[in-house]
């Protein structure tokens, strides 16, 4: 795996090392967007980053929100778009919209759930991570849960 393919692993390692970590994941895009849904950015409690959710155009704003999430332990959904004055101020001028889920590891994103994702990835087992934004319910989904998504 390249370093951009090991973002969950990096977030888990930072969390376990005691520096804290948050995981930011693109959960939706509309129009022209630099990164597709599923792209991730790991942010350490010290401000180190690995990965990308926007090709650099909103990473700074996402890092600020991730550090706040580490302080308050709460997840958040961030939205940036060209109709949003904030989008231009943080650099998203590509003509699209992007929606990003930020979760502090060990808080709303349980360490054992992230560890299960890392283990499945290492074993090359198909897996999806599902989050219901209303109520913040989380679960791992496999081929039996999403047969059309995980075809042979």
Regions found by a protein language model. Name each.
Residues 1-152:
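Segments forming oxygen-rich coordination pockets for charged ligands
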């Amino acid at each position: 795996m390249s370093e951009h393919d090991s973002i969950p692993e990096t977030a888990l390692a930072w969390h376990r090392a005691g520096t804290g970590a948050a995981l930011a994941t693109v959960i939706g895009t509309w129009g022209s967007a630099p990164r597709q849904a599923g792209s991730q950015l790991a942010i350490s409690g010290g401000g180190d980053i690995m990965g990308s959710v926007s090709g650099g155009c909103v990473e700074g704003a996402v890092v600020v929100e991730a550090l706040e999430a580490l302080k308050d332990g709460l997840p958040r959904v961030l939205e940036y778009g060209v109709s949003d004055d904030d989008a231009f101020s943080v650099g998203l001028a590509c003509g699209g919209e992007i929606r990003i889920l930020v979760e502090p590891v060990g808080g709303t994103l349980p360490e054992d759930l992230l560890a299960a994702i890392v283990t499945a990835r290492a074993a090359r087992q198909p897996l999806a991570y599902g989050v219901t934004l209303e109520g913040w319910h989380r679960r791992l989904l496999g081929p039996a849960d999403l047969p059309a998504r995980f075809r042979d």
